[in-house]
Amino acid sequence: MAILLFRVDDRLIHGQVVVGWGRPLGVNRIVLVDDQVAASEWEQDLYRMAVTPDIEVEFVTLNGATARLRDWQSDVRRTLVLTGDLETMVALHAADPVTVHRINLGGVHHRAGRRERLPYLYLTDEEMTRLAALEAAGAAVAAQDLPTTPPVTLKGLG
Protein backbone atom coordinates (compact mmCIF):
# COMPACT_ATOMS: atom_id res chain seq x y z
CA MET A 1 0.00 0.00 0.00
CA ALA A 2 2.95 2.29 0.51
CA ILE A 3 3.14 5.91 1.52
CA LEU A 4 -0.24 7.57 1.13
CA LEU A 5 0.63 11.09 2.22
CA PHE A 6 3.63 13.32 2.85
CA ARG A 7 2.42 16.12 5.12
CA VAL A 8 4.01 19.22 6.65
CA ASP A 9 2.26 20.16 9.90
CA ASP A 10 4.04 22.06 12.65
CA ARG A 11 1.76 20.59 15.32
CA LEU A 12 3.11 17.16 14.40
CA ILE A 13 0.82 14.33 15.57
CA HIS A 14 -2.60 15.59 16.71
CA GLY A 15 -6.28 14.87 16.16
CA GLN A 16 -6.52 16.42 12.71
CA VAL A 17 -3.72 14.16 11.47
CA VAL A 18 -4.94 11.00 13.21
CA VAL A 19 -8.70 11.36 12.73
CA GLY A 20 -8.97 13.87 9.89
CA TRP A 21 -6.43 12.22 7.60
CA GLY A 22 -5.68 8.85 9.16
CA ARG A 23 -9.20 7.45 9.17
CA PRO A 24 -10.29 8.46 5.66
CA LEU A 25 -7.01 7.18 4.20
CA GLY A 26 -7.02 4.00 6.27
CA VAL A 27 -3.58 4.79 7.67
CA ASN A 28 -2.08 2.13 9.90
CA ARG A 29 1.35 3.73 10.34
CA ILE A 30 2.48 7.30 10.97
CA VAL A 31 6.15 8.11 10.54
CA LEU A 32 7.19 11.34 12.25
CA VAL A 33 10.45 12.68 10.84
CA ASP A 34 11.88 14.99 13.48
CA ASP A 35 15.41 14.89 14.92
CA GLN A 36 14.38 16.34 18.28
CA VAL A 37 11.42 14.02 18.85
CA ALA A 38 13.40 11.00 17.65
CA ALA A 39 15.90 11.70 20.45
CA SER A 40 13.30 12.21 23.20
CA GLU A 41 11.40 9.24 24.63
CA TRP A 42 9.33 11.65 26.71
CA GLU A 43 8.09 13.52 23.62
CA GLN A 44 7.49 10.24 21.80
CA ASP A 45 5.28 9.06 24.66
CA LEU A 46 3.24 12.28 24.43
CA TYR A 47 2.68 11.88 20.70
CA ARG A 48 1.80 8.20 21.03
CA MET A 49 -1.07 9.20 23.35
CA ALA A 50 -2.71 11.03 20.43
CA VAL A 51 -2.79 7.89 18.28
CA THR A 52 -5.27 5.03 18.41
CA PRO A 53 -3.85 1.56 19.18
CA ASP A 54 -4.44 0.33 15.63
CA ILE A 55 -1.94 2.83 14.22
CA GLU A 56 1.77 2.15 14.55
CA VAL A 57 3.98 5.20 15.14
CA GLU A 58 7.64 5.51 14.20
CA PHE A 59 9.90 8.38 15.21
CA VAL A 60 12.94 8.82 13.00
CA THR A 61 15.63 11.36 12.31
CA LEU A 62 15.94 12.99 8.91
CA ASN A 63 18.95 10.80 8.11
CA GLY A 64 17.05 7.70 9.20
CA ALA A 65 14.09 8.67 7.05
CA THR A 66 16.10 9.29 3.90
CA ALA A 67 17.61 5.82 4.28
CA ARG A 68 14.18 4.18 4.65
CA LEU A 69 11.93 6.00 2.16
CA ARG A 70 12.03 3.21 -0.43
CA ASP A 71 11.38 0.57 2.24
CA TRP A 72 8.29 2.44 3.44
CA GLN A 73 7.12 2.90 -0.14
CA SER A 74 7.27 -0.84 -0.82
CA ASP A 75 5.78 -1.84 2.56
CA VAL A 76 2.22 -3.15 2.74
CA ARG A 77 1.34 -0.79 5.59
CA ARG A 78 -0.62 2.35 4.71
CA THR A 79 1.77 5.08 5.80
CA LEU A 80 1.54 8.81 6.45
CA VAL A 81 4.93 10.57 6.62
CA LEU A 82 4.82 13.73 8.69
CA THR A 83 7.32 16.54 9.17
CA GLY A 84 7.01 19.62 11.33
CA ASP A 85 8.71 21.99 8.93
CA LEU A 86 9.20 22.64 5.28
CA GLU A 87 12.99 22.26 5.44
CA THR A 88 12.71 18.61 6.47
CA MET A 89 10.26 17.87 3.66
CA VAL A 90 12.53 19.60 1.15
CA ALA A 91 15.40 17.38 2.33
CA LEU A 92 13.25 14.24 1.98
CA HIS A 93 12.32 15.25 -1.55
CA ALA A 94 15.97 15.93 -2.41
CA ALA A 95 16.91 12.47 -1.14
CA ASP A 96 14.26 10.68 -3.20
CA PRO A 97 12.18 12.85 -5.55
CA VAL A 98 10.50 9.80 -7.09
CA THR A 99 9.05 8.66 -3.76
CA VAL A 100 8.37 12.15 -2.35
CA HIS A 101 6.40 13.36 -5.35
CA ARG A 102 3.27 14.80 -3.70
CA ILE A 103 3.50 17.11 -0.71
CA ASN A 104 0.57 18.19 1.45
CA LEU A 105 0.88 21.46 3.35
CA GLY A 106 -1.19 21.30 6.52
CA GLY A 107 -0.89 23.52 9.55
CA VAL A 108 2.06 25.87 9.23
CA HIS A 109 1.35 28.61 11.70
CA HIS A 110 2.31 32.24 12.19
CA ARG A 111 5.86 33.24 13.03
CA ALA A 112 7.79 36.43 12.44
CA GLY A 113 8.19 37.09 8.73
CA ARG A 114 5.40 34.80 7.63
CA ARG A 115 2.18 36.00 6.11
CA GLU A 116 -1.18 34.33 5.89
CA ARG A 117 -1.76 32.36 2.70
CA LEU A 118 -4.74 30.44 4.11
CA PRO A 119 -6.24 30.46 7.62
CA TYR A 120 -4.06 27.48 8.56
CA LEU A 121 -1.02 28.28 6.42
CA TYR A 122 1.53 31.04 6.93
CA LEU A 123 4.64 31.17 4.76
CA THR A 124 7.51 33.55 4.10
CA ASP A 125 8.38 34.58 0.56
CA GLU A 126 11.51 32.42 0.89
CA GLU A 127 9.37 29.40 1.80
CA MET A 128 7.17 30.09 -1.22
CA THR A 129 10.30 30.14 -3.38
CA ARG A 130 11.37 26.76 -1.94
CA LEU A 131 7.94 25.34 -2.69
CA ALA A 132 8.13 26.66 -6.26
CA ALA A 133 11.51 24.93 -6.60
CA LEU A 134 9.92 21.67 -5.41
CA GLU A 135 7.25 22.00 -8.08
CA ALA A 136 9.87 22.81 -10.71
CA ALA A 137 11.66 19.61 -9.66
CA GLY A 138 8.50 17.59 -10.30
CA ALA A 139 6.73 17.51 -6.93
CA ALA A 140 3.02 18.27 -6.72
CA VAL A 141 2.54 20.71 -3.83
CA ALA A 142 -0.89 21.56 -2.42
CA ALA A 143 -2.28 22.98 0.79
CA GLN A 144 -5.19 21.10 2.32
CA ASP A 145 -6.13 21.05 5.98
CA LEU A 146 -8.53 18.09 5.68
CA PRO A 147 -9.35 15.62 2.92
CA THR A 148 -12.92 16.96 2.84
CA THR A 149 -11.73 20.41 1.73
CA PRO A 150 -10.46 21.16 -1.77
CA PRO A 151 -6.68 21.33 -2.18
CA VAL A 152 -5.14 24.70 -2.98
CA THR A 153 -2.28 24.64 -5.45
CA LEU A 154 0.84 26.70 -5.00
CA LYS A 155 -0.46 29.21 -7.56
CA GLY A 156 -3.56 29.64 -5.41
CA LEU A 157 -1.41 30.61 -2.42
CA GLY A 158 -0.01 33.62 -4.30
Where are the regions a protein language model picked out?
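Long, hydrophobic N-terminal alpha-helical segment
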Residues: 1-51, 56
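Structural motif
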Residues: 2-6, 28-31, 56-58, 78-81, ...
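A general structural motif
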Residues: 9-12, 61, 123
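Short, solvent-exposed amphipathic alpha-helical segments in soluble enzyme
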Residues: 21-24, 46-51, 95-99, 120-121, ...
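Short, ordered loop/turn segments at secondary-structure junctions
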Residues: 34-38, 61-64, 86-87, 106-110, ...
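Short basic, glycine-rich beta-strand/loop surfaces that mediate nucleic-acid
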Residues: 40, 46-50, 54-58, 67-83, ...
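Ordered, amphipathic secondary-structure segments that act as subunit-interaction surfaces
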Residues: 58-106
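Glycine-rich, aromatic-bearing surface loops/beta-hairpins
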Residues: 101-158
